[in-house]
């Protein structure tokens, strides 16, 4: 997995490439941790190049969503492929998260 983070003021875009699974999810969590302490962050997760997400990856996504929204921020997932979308749908995450 490759993670690229860009920030402009309070807008943080996280681009994920590859697989978000048990092996790679701790890396993403570490990359996101600095933004968990900030108030009013608008986090956008661009999943255009994400190939797969496991339950460990879903946990990181849900933790990020809960932490950021609890501090007055927003969390949006964009550009997921059909396979990743089906995982979000089957787990009910698509009802919890903002997916564009």
Q: Could you tell me what each predicted segment is?
A:
Residues 1-15:
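Short beta-strand/loop segment at the start of cytosolic alpha/beta domains
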Residues 98-100:
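Short acidic-hydrophobic, aromatic-tinged amphipathic segments that line or gate anion-handling sites
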Residues 22-96:
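Amphipathic alpha-helical interaction surfaces in cytosolic regulatory modules
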């Amino acid at each position: 997995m490759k993670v690229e983070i860009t920030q402009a003021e309070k807008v943080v875009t996280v681009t994920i490439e590859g697989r978000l699974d048990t092996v790679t999810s701790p890396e993403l969590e570490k990359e996101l941790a600095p933004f968990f302490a900030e108030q009013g962050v608008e986090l956008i997760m661009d999943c255009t190049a994400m190939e797969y997400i496991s339950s460990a990856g879903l946990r990181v996504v849900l933790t990020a969503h809960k932490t950021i929204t609890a501090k007055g921020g927003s969390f949006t997932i964009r550009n997921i492929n059909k396979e990743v979308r089906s995982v979000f749908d089957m787990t009910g995450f698509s009802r919890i998260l903002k997916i564009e």
